[in-house]
Amino acid sequence: MKFCKVVAIMNITDYNVLHEPIQRLDVPGVTVSMVKGFGDYVNNFSPFGFSDNMKLEIYTTEEQAETIAAELSSLADQLTEGGGVVAIEPVHQLMNVRKLDD
């Protein structure tokens, strides 16, 4: 089975728009990180033009990655000005690391 990582970088205020579709797609898990950067939107009131954004990372199967990326991209008309980006990255190996109870 092949795995991929779906990465979406969007304005931090758009989390409410993305939350429900992610739950509806029954993704195995999601990591949300706060990041700073600029793209189409440049914040002229902050150093380097950076604005506050969020980065979502979802590890999933190759098949489900296409569905997730398409769903996130379809929400573009509901997002804050400047939108964001969605990417699918191949994952060479995925290991679940956790402590097992004795």
Where are these regions (language model features)?
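Positively charged, small/polar-rich N-terminal and surface patches that mediate targeting and assembly
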Residues: 1-102
